[in-house]
Amino acid sequence: MNCIKQFLLAICFSLALTCQDHVLVGGTTTRDIIVPKISEWQVTVVNGLTTGETLFIHCKSKEDDLGEINLKFRNRFSWNFGENMLHSTFFWCYMNKDNGHMNVNVFWDDVILFHRCGWKNCIWTAKTDGLYLWNSASGEDVLSRKWEVGW
């Protein structure tokens, strides 16, 4: 009996996916409710070091190595991705400047981070005293982590 229920549920779900897509209030569609879209995100790292020095960054996830980047003052590096269905997408970066370095998480599944990033765009700015995250809710950069001394 359990197998029959699962089979019928699978058929109903398949039919729902193939049914005509109706647009609801606010642009949401019936298909969006049945199969929610995977969130699209952008992470940006900005060199805001007022000393004019170059910022070295190396960002990666479990699946993707984004390479080593040397960012000149006021330049930025961005990447786009879709959050996976298990909500385990995770990016981190190693950053280095003349007299400091850090390993820092720049994207992970966290509702507070999502709120600060405006549910789509996390902007990290390296400044002389540390790394700041743009809080879109408050409209200001918030110090997230201070530089570790040395290389």
From Swiss-Prot:
Subcellular location: Secreted
Domain of life assignment: Eukaryota
UniProt entry keywords in alphabetical sequence: Secreted, Self-incompatibility, Signal
A Pfam family hit: Self-incomp_S1
Leader peptide range in chain numbering: 1-18
GO cellular-component term (any): extracellular region
Alphabetical GO biological process terms: pollen-pistil interaction; rejection of self pollen
Chief location bin: secreted
Record's keyword annotation contains Signal: yes
Tissue distribution: Restricted to floral tissues.
InterPro entries: Self-incomp_S1
UniProt family annotation: Belongs to the plant self-incompatibility (S1) protein family.
Protein name, entry field: S-protein homolog 1
Organism for this UniProt entry: Arabidopsis thaliana
Gene name of the encoded protein: SPH1
